[in-house]
Design a protein with these regions (language model features):
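Acidic, glycine-rich active-site loops and adjacent beta-strand->loop/helix elements
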Residues: 83-88, 110-111, 136-142, 188-189, ...
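Short, well-ordered amphipathic alpha-helical segments that serve as non-catalytic structural scaffolds
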Residues: 55-71, 119, 204-219, 285-290
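Long, repeat-rich segments with strong aromatic
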Residues: 208, 214-246
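Active-site-adjacent elements of ketosynthase-type condensing enzymes
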Residues: 84-100, 134, 140-153, 239-241, ...
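Conserved beta-ketoacyl condensing-enzyme motif
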Residues: 17, 51-110, 226-241
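Short glycine/threonine-rich loop-to-helix capping motif typified by GTGT followed
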Residues: 93-96, 235-250, 314-321
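Active-site-proximal alpha-helical scaffold in enzymes
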Residues: 106-134, 173, 277-298
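Condensing-enzyme catalytic core mediating Claisen C-C bond formation in acyl metabolism
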Residues: 1-52, 150-214, 219-222, 252, ...
Length: 342
Protein backbone atom coordinates (compact mmCIF):
# COMPACT_ATOMS: atom_id res chain seq x y z
CA UNK A 1 0.00 0.00 0.00
CA UNK A 2 1.10 3.55 -0.64
CA UNK A 3 1.98 6.01 2.10
CA UNK A 4 1.18 9.71 1.83
CA UNK A 5 3.53 12.63 2.38
CA UNK A 6 1.71 15.85 1.63
CA UNK A 7 0.30 15.50 -1.87
CA UNK A 8 2.69 12.68 -2.79
CA UNK A 9 1.94 8.95 -2.65
CA UNK A 10 4.99 6.75 -2.11
CA UNK A 11 5.03 3.04 -2.90
CA UNK A 12 7.33 0.99 -0.60
CA UNK A 13 6.90 -1.90 -3.07
CA UNK A 14 6.74 -0.13 -6.42
CA UNK A 15 4.38 -1.42 -9.09
CA UNK A 16 6.22 -2.05 -12.35
CA UNK A 17 5.78 -1.27 -16.02
CA UNK A 18 6.06 -4.80 -17.36
CA UNK A 19 5.77 -3.83 -21.03
CA UNK A 20 5.17 -0.79 -23.19
CA UNK A 21 4.53 0.10 -26.82
CA UNK A 22 4.16 3.19 -28.99
CA UNK A 23 2.94 3.75 -32.53
CA UNK A 24 3.12 6.96 -34.56
CA UNK A 25 1.99 8.51 -37.81
CA UNK A 26 3.68 10.00 -40.85
CA UNK A 27 5.24 13.08 -39.24
CA UNK A 28 6.52 10.99 -36.33
CA UNK A 29 8.21 8.75 -38.89
CA UNK A 30 10.14 11.80 -40.13
CA UNK A 31 11.16 12.91 -36.63
CA UNK A 32 14.46 12.56 -34.74
CA UNK A 33 12.83 9.85 -32.58
CA UNK A 34 11.45 7.81 -35.50
CA UNK A 35 13.66 4.80 -34.76
CA UNK A 36 12.32 4.59 -31.20
CA UNK A 37 8.71 3.91 -32.23
CA UNK A 38 7.61 0.28 -32.36
CA UNK A 39 5.57 0.94 -35.50
CA UNK A 40 4.92 3.88 -37.81
CA UNK A 41 2.15 4.59 -40.31
CA UNK A 42 2.69 6.48 -43.56
CA UNK A 43 -1.08 6.98 -43.86
CA UNK A 44 -2.55 8.97 -40.97
CA UNK A 45 -5.99 7.55 -41.75
CA UNK A 46 -4.72 4.04 -40.98
CA UNK A 47 -7.09 2.77 -43.65
CA UNK A 48 -10.14 4.10 -41.80
CA UNK A 49 -13.04 6.21 -43.07
CA UNK A 50 -12.40 9.14 -40.70
CA UNK A 51 -9.64 10.72 -38.62
CA UNK A 52 -11.55 9.82 -35.45
CA UNK A 53 -11.75 6.16 -36.43
CA UNK A 54 -8.04 6.29 -37.26
CA UNK A 55 -7.22 7.39 -33.71
CA UNK A 56 -9.30 4.53 -32.30
CA UNK A 57 -7.34 2.16 -34.52
CA UNK A 58 -4.10 3.71 -33.28
CA UNK A 59 -5.09 2.88 -29.69
CA UNK A 60 -6.18 -0.64 -30.60
CA UNK A 61 -2.93 -1.46 -32.35
CA UNK A 62 -0.86 0.01 -29.51
CA UNK A 63 -2.74 -1.87 -26.79
CA UNK A 64 -2.46 -5.17 -28.62
CA UNK A 65 1.23 -4.65 -29.36
CA UNK A 66 1.90 -3.86 -25.70
CA UNK A 67 0.19 -7.09 -24.64
CA UNK A 68 2.06 -9.05 -27.31
CA UNK A 69 5.40 -7.72 -26.04
CA UNK A 70 4.43 -8.88 -22.52
CA UNK A 71 3.36 -12.32 -23.83
CA UNK A 72 -0.06 -11.53 -22.40
CA UNK A 73 -3.65 -11.41 -23.66
CA UNK A 74 -6.74 -9.37 -22.82
CA UNK A 75 -7.57 -12.01 -20.19
CA UNK A 76 -4.51 -10.87 -18.22
CA UNK A 77 -5.79 -7.29 -17.92
CA UNK A 78 -8.01 -6.31 -14.98
CA UNK A 79 -8.65 -2.74 -16.14
CA UNK A 80 -7.97 -0.34 -19.00
CA UNK A 81 -7.27 3.28 -18.06
CA UNK A 82 -7.24 5.42 -21.18
CA UNK A 83 -7.96 8.89 -22.47
CA UNK A 84 -7.58 11.20 -25.46
CA UNK A 85 -8.52 14.69 -26.66
CA UNK A 86 -11.70 13.87 -28.54
CA UNK A 87 -15.01 14.97 -27.03
CA UNK A 88 -16.09 12.45 -24.38
CA UNK A 89 -12.85 10.50 -25.00
CA UNK A 90 -14.45 8.66 -27.89
CA UNK A 91 -11.19 7.25 -29.27
CA UNK A 92 -10.61 5.49 -25.95
CA UNK A 93 -14.22 4.41 -25.53
CA UNK A 94 -14.40 2.88 -28.99
CA UNK A 95 -11.03 1.15 -28.47
CA UNK A 96 -12.30 -0.24 -25.15
CA UNK A 97 -15.39 -1.53 -26.96
CA UNK A 98 -13.22 -3.50 -29.36
CA UNK A 99 -10.84 -4.76 -26.66
CA UNK A 100 -13.68 -5.93 -24.41
CA UNK A 101 -11.86 -4.88 -21.23
CA UNK A 102 -13.18 -3.28 -18.04
CA UNK A 103 -12.66 0.41 -18.79
CA UNK A 104 -12.28 3.62 -16.83
CA UNK A 105 -11.97 6.66 -19.06
CA UNK A 106 -9.69 9.46 -17.91
CA UNK A 107 -9.45 13.05 -19.04
CA UNK A 108 -6.54 15.24 -18.12
CA UNK A 109 -5.90 16.57 -21.62
CA UNK A 110 -2.18 16.12 -22.33
CA UNK A 111 -1.52 15.12 -18.70
CA UNK A 112 -3.58 11.93 -19.08
CA UNK A 113 -0.66 9.48 -19.44
CA UNK A 114 0.82 10.49 -16.09
CA UNK A 115 -2.68 10.44 -14.59
CA UNK A 116 -3.26 6.91 -15.89
CA UNK A 117 0.10 5.70 -14.58
CA UNK A 118 -0.58 7.30 -11.20
CA UNK A 119 -4.08 5.88 -10.81
CA UNK A 120 -2.92 2.54 -12.15
CA UNK A 121 -0.01 2.36 -9.71
CA UNK A 122 -2.39 3.07 -6.81
CA UNK A 123 -4.73 0.28 -7.91
CA UNK A 124 -1.90 -2.21 -8.41
CA UNK A 125 -0.29 -1.32 -5.08
CA UNK A 126 -3.61 -1.78 -3.28
CA UNK A 127 -4.11 -5.23 -4.81
CA UNK A 128 -7.04 -4.10 -6.95
CA UNK A 129 -5.47 -5.07 -10.28
CA UNK A 130 -3.03 -7.79 -11.33
CA UNK A 131 -2.56 -6.40 -14.82
CA UNK A 132 -3.57 -2.91 -15.89
CA UNK A 133 -3.24 -1.08 -19.20
CA UNK A 134 -2.54 2.67 -19.11
CA UNK A 135 -2.90 4.26 -22.54
CA UNK A 136 -3.37 7.61 -24.27
CA UNK A 137 -3.45 8.87 -27.83
CA UNK A 138 -3.84 11.97 -29.95
CA UNK A 139 -4.25 12.69 -33.65
CA UNK A 140 -3.31 15.93 -35.37
CA UNK A 141 -6.37 15.98 -37.61
CA UNK A 142 -8.95 15.22 -34.91
CA UNK A 143 -7.46 17.87 -32.62
CA UNK A 144 -7.33 20.53 -35.33
CA UNK A 145 -10.93 19.89 -36.29
CA UNK A 146 -12.12 20.00 -32.68
CA UNK A 147 -10.07 22.82 -31.17
CA UNK A 148 -8.83 25.03 -34.00
CA UNK A 149 -9.86 25.23 -37.66
CA UNK A 150 -10.62 22.73 -40.44
CA UNK A 151 -7.46 21.57 -42.19
CA UNK A 152 -8.67 22.94 -45.52
CA UNK A 153 -8.96 26.43 -44.04
CA UNK A 154 -5.18 26.83 -44.12
CA UNK A 155 -4.84 29.02 -41.02
CA UNK A 156 -1.40 30.51 -40.32
CA UNK A 157 0.18 29.04 -37.19
CA UNK A 158 1.68 31.38 -34.58
CA UNK A 159 5.29 30.98 -33.32
CA UNK A 160 3.99 29.74 -29.95
CA UNK A 161 1.73 27.09 -31.52
CA UNK A 162 2.48 23.38 -31.15
CA UNK A 163 1.80 20.41 -33.41
CA UNK A 164 -0.49 17.72 -32.00
CA UNK A 165 1.24 14.36 -32.33
CA UNK A 166 -0.44 11.52 -34.18
CA UNK A 167 0.68 8.84 -31.76
CA UNK A 168 -0.34 6.49 -28.98
CA UNK A 169 1.51 4.89 -26.08
CA UNK A 170 0.50 2.06 -23.76
CA UNK A 171 2.01 0.56 -20.60
CA UNK A 172 1.14 -2.72 -18.90
CA UNK A 173 1.35 -2.28 -15.13
CA UNK A 174 1.72 -5.11 -12.62
CA UNK A 175 1.95 -5.07 -8.80
CA UNK A 176 5.45 -6.59 -8.86
CA UNK A 177 7.97 -8.26 -11.12
CA UNK A 178 10.50 -7.17 -13.69
CA UNK A 179 10.30 -3.69 -15.15
CA UNK A 180 10.71 0.01 -14.48
CA UNK A 181 9.27 0.81 -11.07
CA UNK A 182 6.77 3.54 -10.20
CA UNK A 183 8.10 4.73 -6.85
CA UNK A 184 5.91 7.76 -6.23
CA UNK A 185 3.05 9.80 -7.67
CA UNK A 186 2.02 13.41 -7.10
CA UNK A 187 -1.40 14.32 -8.43
CA UNK A 188 -1.41 17.98 -9.39
CA UNK A 189 -3.62 20.91 -8.46
CA UNK A 190 -5.21 23.07 -11.13
CA UNK A 191 -3.29 26.28 -11.85
CA UNK A 192 -4.51 29.29 -13.83
CA UNK A 193 -2.42 32.42 -14.35
CA UNK A 194 -4.85 34.02 -16.76
CA UNK A 195 -3.62 32.82 -20.17
CA UNK A 196 -6.34 32.96 -22.85
CA UNK A 197 -4.34 32.27 -26.02
CA UNK A 198 -5.27 28.82 -27.35
CA UNK A 199 -2.14 28.97 -29.51
CA UNK A 200 0.13 29.23 -26.47
CA UNK A 201 -0.57 26.11 -24.43
CA UNK A 202 3.00 26.03 -23.12
CA UNK A 203 2.51 29.30 -21.25
CA UNK A 204 -0.75 28.04 -19.74
CA UNK A 205 0.74 24.73 -18.60
CA UNK A 206 4.19 25.78 -17.35
CA UNK A 207 2.89 27.07 -13.97
CA UNK A 208 1.15 23.74 -13.34
CA UNK A 209 4.34 21.78 -14.01
CA UNK A 210 6.36 24.07 -11.75
CA UNK A 211 3.81 23.86 -8.93
CA UNK A 212 3.65 20.05 -9.01
CA UNK A 213 7.43 19.65 -9.13
CA UNK A 214 7.92 22.03 -6.21
CA UNK A 215 5.30 20.17 -4.19
CA UNK A 216 6.93 16.80 -4.93
CA UNK A 217 10.40 18.03 -3.99
CA UNK A 218 9.07 19.44 -0.71
CA UNK A 219 7.07 16.30 0.12
CA UNK A 220 10.00 13.96 -0.52
CA UNK A 221 12.83 16.22 0.68
CA UNK A 222 14.71 15.74 -2.58
CA UNK A 223 16.65 18.02 -4.92
CA UNK A 224 16.46 18.18 -8.73
CA UNK A 225 20.07 17.03 -9.14
CA UNK A 226 19.21 13.67 -7.55
CA UNK A 227 17.46 12.66 -10.79
CA UNK A 228 18.93 11.80 -14.16
CA UNK A 229 16.16 13.72 -15.89
CA UNK A 230 13.10 15.80 -15.09
CA UNK A 231 10.91 15.27 -18.13
CA UNK A 232 7.84 17.41 -18.76
CA UNK A 233 5.10 16.29 -21.12
CA UNK A 234 4.51 18.84 -23.83
CA UNK A 235 5.43 22.34 -22.73
CA UNK A 236 7.26 22.81 -26.02
CA UNK A 237 10.10 25.27 -26.47
CA UNK A 238 8.19 28.32 -25.20
CA UNK A 239 6.63 26.58 -22.21
CA UNK A 240 9.90 24.89 -21.24
CA UNK A 241 11.66 28.24 -21.02
CA UNK A 242 8.86 29.62 -18.84
CA UNK A 243 8.95 26.48 -16.67
CA UNK A 244 12.67 26.94 -15.98
CA UNK A 245 12.19 30.65 -15.30
CA UNK A 246 9.42 29.95 -12.78
CA UNK A 247 11.64 27.47 -10.94
CA UNK A 248 14.63 29.82 -11.08
CA UNK A 249 12.49 32.39 -9.29
CA UNK A 250 12.11 29.79 -6.51
CA UNK A 251 15.88 29.24 -6.36
CA UNK A 252 16.01 26.06 -8.47
CA UNK A 253 18.24 26.03 -11.55
CA UNK A 254 17.36 22.95 -13.60
CA UNK A 255 20.21 21.44 -15.59
CA UNK A 256 18.51 18.10 -16.21
CA UNK A 257 15.19 19.21 -17.69
CA UNK A 258 13.96 17.75 -20.97
CA UNK A 259 10.54 18.08 -22.58
CA UNK A 260 8.74 15.47 -24.67
CA UNK A 261 7.23 18.19 -26.83
CA UNK A 262 10.68 19.59 -27.58
CA UNK A 263 12.23 16.16 -28.21
CA UNK A 264 9.72 14.61 -30.58
CA UNK A 265 10.12 16.80 -33.67
CA UNK A 266 12.79 18.83 -35.40
CA UNK A 267 11.23 22.26 -34.75
CA UNK A 268 12.78 23.96 -37.77
CA UNK A 269 13.09 21.08 -40.19
CA UNK A 270 9.52 19.90 -39.58
CA UNK A 271 7.97 23.36 -39.17
CA UNK A 272 6.27 22.65 -35.84
CA UNK A 273 7.11 26.03 -34.29
CA UNK A 274 7.14 25.51 -30.49
CA UNK A 275 7.21 21.71 -30.66
CA UNK A 276 4.83 18.80 -30.19
CA UNK A 277 1.74 18.43 -28.03
CA UNK A 278 -1.10 16.00 -27.34
CA UNK A 279 -1.57 13.05 -24.96
CA UNK A 280 0.08 10.85 -27.56
CA UNK A 281 3.22 12.99 -27.56
CA UNK A 282 4.39 12.31 -24.01
CA UNK A 283 3.00 8.74 -24.08
CA UNK A 284 5.05 7.90 -27.17
CA UNK A 285 8.22 9.59 -25.91
CA UNK A 286 7.80 7.84 -22.56
CA UNK A 287 7.33 4.41 -24.11
CA UNK A 288 9.84 4.74 -26.93
CA UNK A 289 12.54 6.92 -25.42
CA UNK A 290 12.46 7.23 -21.62
CA UNK A 291 11.50 3.73 -20.47
CA UNK A 292 14.08 1.91 -22.65
CA UNK A 293 16.83 4.10 -21.17
CA UNK A 294 15.75 3.15 -17.67
CA UNK A 295 15.52 -0.53 -18.64
CA UNK A 296 19.07 -0.40 -20.04
CA UNK A 297 20.12 1.40 -16.84
CA UNK A 298 21.46 4.29 -18.86
CA UNK A 299 19.39 6.32 -16.41
CA UNK A 300 18.31 5.38 -12.91
CA UNK A 301 15.76 7.90 -11.62
CA UNK A 302 13.49 10.03 -13.78
CA UNK A 303 10.61 12.35 -12.94
CA UNK A 304 7.87 12.31 -15.57
CA UNK A 305 5.51 15.30 -15.42
CA UNK A 306 2.78 15.33 -18.03
CA UNK A 307 0.88 18.60 -18.35
CA UNK A 308 -2.63 19.33 -19.59
CA UNK A 309 -4.70 22.39 -20.51
CA UNK A 310 -8.25 21.84 -19.27
CA UNK A 311 -10.20 24.15 -21.54
CA UNK A 312 -12.85 23.13 -24.09
CA UNK A 313 -14.10 24.55 -27.38
CA UNK A 314 -16.98 26.16 -25.49
CA UNK A 315 -14.92 27.82 -22.77
CA UNK A 316 -12.52 29.13 -25.41
CA UNK A 317 -15.38 30.75 -27.33
CA UNK A 318 -16.62 32.22 -24.03
CA UNK A 319 -13.15 33.79 -23.62
CA UNK A 320 -12.44 31.97 -20.37
CA UNK A 321 -8.86 31.65 -19.16
CA UNK A 322 -7.09 28.30 -19.56
CA UNK A 323 -6.69 26.21 -16.38
CA UNK A 324 -3.93 23.62 -16.44
CA UNK A 325 -2.76 20.64 -14.42
CA UNK A 326 0.35 18.50 -14.13
CA UNK A 327 0.73 15.05 -12.60
CA UNK A 328 4.13 13.63 -11.63
CA UNK A 329 5.35 10.03 -11.64
CA UNK A 330 8.74 9.01 -10.28
CA UNK A 331 10.25 6.22 -12.37
CA UNK A 332 13.16 4.04 -11.30
CA UNK A 333 15.35 1.53 -13.10
CA UNK A 334 14.83 -2.03 -11.82
CA UNK A 335 17.74 -2.07 -9.37
CA UNK A 336 16.77 1.38 -8.01
CA UNK A 337 13.16 0.59 -7.16
CA UNK A 338 13.56 0.39 -3.41
CA UNK A 339 16.39 2.87 -2.96
CA UNK A 340 16.71 6.64 -2.82
CA UNK A 341 15.43 9.25 -0.42
CA UNK A 342 11.71 8.82 -0.97
Amino acid sequence: MATRRGDTLIFPKPPVIAAHACIGGKKEGESPLAAEFDELHSDNRLGQASWEAAETQLQLQTARLCLKKAHATEKDVSLLLAGDLQAQCTASGYAARALGLPFAGLFGACSTMAEALGVGACLCSAGMADGLLAMTSSHFCTAERQFRTPLSYGAVRTPTAQWTATAAGACLLRPAGQGVGIRAVTFGRVQDLGIRDINNMGAAMAPAAAATLLRYLTDTNTQPQEFDAICTGDLGHVGSQLFRELLAAEGLLLKNHVDCGSLLYDAEGQSVHSGASGPGCCAAVLCGHLLPRLERRGQHRVLFLATGALMSQTTFLQKETIPAISHLVELAAPEEQNGGNT
